[in-house]
Design a protein with these regions (language model features):
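Nuclease-adjacent, charged terminal/linker segments that flank catalytic cores
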Residues: 1-152, 335
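Histidine (H) residue identity feature
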Residues: 18, 34, 83-86, 93, ...
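Alpha-helix initiation/capping motif
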Residues: 22, 36, 40-44, 179, ...
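Generic structural signal of hydrophobic/aromatic residues within well-ordered alpha-helices
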Residues: 134, 186-197, 259, 322, ...
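Catalytic centers of nucleases
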Residues: 149-252
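Active-site/pore-lining binding-face segments in mid-to-C-terminal subdomains
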Residues: 227-292
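Domain-level recognition of nuclease-like catalytic cores that cleave nucleotide substrates
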Residues: 265-335
Length: 335
């Protein structure tokens, strides 16, 4: 029997206060799975409090002392106040999402930022947003259901990459599950890629495990031949990652810093990282990145850029949307 598309939704994310992108995604997940397609600020605070009662590690207690705190009324009241303040802060950030995603955000938020609701009539781009939301929430998705999300996410990333590259560029998936151009052992695939980008590979097959069919940190590869066969062409490599917490480490997997010692080209290639998370925020009245201190030298395409680029370039959203997952999530009718 197939497992439900989502699990353990009553448990808030084990995330710090500053990881607003994870908390807001949790709110949106609770909203689309709710029997009335809504979720409130009070419900979030209650979920955090219930988790704190059953888990010794309150995710919001970032300055906890080593010693166990005394269990008294004042401590509990202070903790509840902190949970309510955090819930209010998260819903305030949803106002930011409402602003920047505009009509493409599949939710509505009341004027006091107390309750979020799913819009009654969802467009294809709304459903694509929800597909990205589920892809960004794999900790709540049974592992056997991941592929239906991650495969389409890589396809969506490839379609965006095609639009970002100049006319005439070659853009191909390299990930083991998606490619038809690069097949077989990883060494053989890297050898073919090296020829495509007119470089040299300082590796031998003996350097790899005998049955290595991985992707070497590459999910999408692109280059432009510039009309001849000489070295020195524009190249770009990309990694696609759905992890909500491990993305700082994955961001540079496709970069020259990791691969450049073995795959040599006349100049360094551009590095892209595609993520379904929304890391946008406002700082000092200007759009900025959350967690920017964790960024490496990569061009990041997050959920906001996905949605805006898909609409700007008229990329059909339906073929890269996990419709079955979205429909099943909305049909869970949880409280």
């Amino acid at each position: 029997m197939t497992e439900p598309v989502l699990k353990n939704l009553t448990s808030p994310p084990k995330a710090g206060r500053h990881e607003l992108y994870r908390w807001c995604d949790y709110i949106e997940l609770r909203c689309i799975t709710h029997i009335d397609q809504r979720f409130s600020r009070d419900a979030l605070a209650e979920a955090i409090e219930e988790q704190a009662d059953t888990d010794a590690d309150d995710p919001l207690n970032e300055s906890a002392e080593d010693d166990e705190p005394e269990d008294n009324t004042d401590d509990r009241a202070a903790a509840n106040d902190a949970h309510e303040q955090h819930a209010a802060f998260c819903f305030k950030h949803l106002r930011w999402r409402e602003q920047v995603f505009a009509e493409h955000w599949p939710f509505t938020l009341d004027e006091h930022a107390i309750e979020i609701r799913v819009k009654e009539n969802l467009t294809e781009i709304h459903r694509f947003y929800l597909s990205l939301l589920l892809s960004a929430s794999l900790s709540y998705v049974p592992k056997k259901r991941w592929r239906g999300l991650t495969g389409l996410f890589e396809q969506a990333s490839t379609e965006i990459m095609k639009q970002l590259m100049p006319k005439g560029a070659e853009v191909h998936p390299f990930g083991a599950a998606e490619t038809t151009r690069y097949t077989g052992h990883l060494f053989d695939r890297l050898t073919k890629l090296t020829k495509d980008v007119r470089g040299s590979l300082d590796l031998k097959k003996a350097h790899f495990a005998g049955h290595d069919s991985g992707d070497g940190g590459l999910d999408i590869v692109a280059w432009h031949g510039l009309g001849d066969t000489r070295k020195g062409i524009p190249i770009a490599f990309a990694q696609c990652g759905c992890t909500a917490s491990g993305w700082p480490d994955k961001m540079l997997q496709a970069s020259p810093a990791r691969l450049g010692g073995h795959l040599n080209t006349l100049h360094k290639w551009g590095t892209y990282y595609f993520m379904p998370l929304d890391l946008s925020t406002e700082i000092d009245g200007t759009m900025d990145w959350q967690m920017f201190h964790d960024f490496g030298e990569a061009i990041v395409i997050d959920r906001l850029r996905f949605i805006r680029l898909a609409t700007d370039y008229d990329i059909p959203a339906a073929p890269v949307t996990a419709h079955d997952h979205v429909d099943e999530a909305r049909s869970l009718k949880l409280s």
